[in-house]
Amino acid sequence: MSRIQFENVSKHYAGKTVVAVDNLNLGIEAGEFLTLLGPSGSGKTTSLMMLAGFERPSAGTIRFDGVPIETLPAHRRNMGVVFQSHALFPHLTVAENVAFPLKVRRLSRSETATRVTSALEKVRLAPFAERMPHQLSGGQQQRVALARALVFEPRLVLLDEPLSALDKKLREEMQLEIRRLHRELGVTMAFVTHDQSEAMVMSDRVAVFNHGRIEQIGPPQQLYDAPCNTFVAGFLGDNNKVEGKSGPDPVAPAGQMEIRLANGLTLRGRRAGHSTNGPSQVLCVRPECLKVALDAGQLETGNQIGARLVDIIQQGDHWRLVAALSDEDGGLRAENWTVKVNVGSVPAGLTVGQPVVLRFRPEDAWIF
């Protein structure tokens, strides 16, 4: 049995026509790190707040180790919660902030002191015990919030976009810090974010939310390599897509299909498990799966599509090429494509405005 189980859980607010969470069924296993990923308004934070006890479901059941908890007050759920805002008491020292949950639980002074020291050591802030919150950096303040969430040894820790206010360097440091704590303590963690790179780095599993429902759930690499639809493909990582019409392809290998674009070009890719049955299809391919050349003769056989180079952007360890697909008749429905090329692999003589050929293997593309 899962540690946490959402069973047909829904949440709607009075006066609003949009359902915040729509018939959610989700299990969180003991000891796992599950990320709820999605855009603003997708239902991920509302789901976490219902689990924490700050919101009550409109329908359905939430179980913690088999026991229904949807009517249980938040302070009786024994869950640690870390918020984006840190929510530290400005008039208390670091140690006093961490000790607060223990004072509420009426632990002895000696037990409180022992646990506070241990929690601060876990987050590597023991030397800062007597400092005030305003004397700490943003990353240090978030470590204090983590220590406070862990000090009473909860069975579950909930993290609501705790790193979104930090700069890139601090955010990456805290990602590794939280991963380390999860690995060392083995505590179950549920993490909310809209940052797909955060989800990829930190999670055992990712649940991708959209319009109050889970589109897909699984290990991050599985979702990246085999998205179930165009939303997941576009939200979890960069993605190029183009629309076309499906058609018979008697020579396509098993599991592949062919689409014909508005400009008459045919492309082949893997048939997605949730591929639509209608005539209109969407082909998706990742930027790192594309190769670029000045003419078709420089590329291996496979899917090839003409384009015009719009921009060349250097991004540290790689180049990002932006290309507009060739569309003489104006009927092609596609945004500009991007190509990720390692430094040193950009074809010589490549300039903005130049016609190029893009190539990708059928097994690297999905057709939905």
Which residues are covered by each model-predicted region?
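Non-catalytic connector elements of ABC transporters
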Residues: N239, D249-F368
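The feature captures the beta-strand-to-loop junction immediately N-terminal to the Walker
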Residues: L37-P39
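Conserved structural motif at the start of ABC-family nucleotide-binding domains
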Residues: I4, V19-V21
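ABC ATPase nucleotide-binding domain helices that frame the ATP-binding cleft
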Residues: T45-L48, V144
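Helix-to-loop junction immediately C-terminal to a conserved catalytic motif
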Residues: A52
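ABC ATPase nucleotide-binding domains
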Residues: A74-G80, Q84-G234
